[in-house]
């Protein structure tokens, strides 16, 4: 998600992240990429077992049908928040967090965001753990998950529903659960969205040739977070997300290419 955000030039970016061991190439490569795009990496800590692993199984349509993961040790992030949280949050525009992180990290993040009046956007890697954080969803500005994860969240089978039908059901669930905004991605059908005020709808996916769906969800989340941060409506933010997701699945790269803000409908000029 961070890499997706940094592909939009001239947006101020500050991140507090714990990434893997210093000798592990993937973690170091991510840091180098962020630094190359002038992302502030001062708060990154390289620690043993700081980078987990994830194995995913995809079907012929490019959708994840099974996965297994080894969670990293994320507790160093809590230490970062305790020491530097005020400095980070006071300068941030908004926050993106995985809600299935350690409960103490989520609580500290939400407390700091409330203190400085910052929006917090939530994503999830393991919904089985995310369910244990369900109460926190009411404190998020928006939460993003896929239809399978939404089924776990609401203990409901959403398979067989059209996007329009799913939007109606999700709207009802969101109001009942008092979740401010919820976006549910539905693969090749795009995404559905709903908020507590009754706004709901479907944002179709862009018609493109699929090569590899890896990273599409992260890019969608990046686009959604950027859109909402810069004052776009929920539908408009979803459209930015689908734009970035489409740019990922047409290549073998797992991160979207660089876009100028105005290409995505953001009223921000970039200096030549």
Per-region residue spans from a language model:
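Short, hinge-like loop/turn segments at secondary-structure boundaries
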Residues: 32-36, 59-63, 137-141, 160-163, ...
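Hydrophobic/aromatic residues located in beta-strands of well-ordered beta-sheets
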Residues: 13-15, 120, 182
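Conserved N-terminal subdomain of the carbohydrate kinase-like
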Residues: 2-94, 262-272
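Short, acidic/turn-prone active-site loops that include or flank metal/cofactor-
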Residues: 70-74, 124-127, 148-150, 206-208
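Conserved beta-alpha-beta core of the PfkB/ribokinase-like small-molecule kinase fold
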Residues: 92-169, 189-191
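Glycine-centered short loops/turns at secondary-structure junctions
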Residues: 9-12, 38, 117, 178, ...
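Conserved phosphate-binding/catalytic region of the ribokinase-like
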Residues: 129, 156-272
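Structural alpha-helical scaffold elements that stabilize or flank donor/cofactor-binding regions
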Residues: 87-88, 135-136, 175
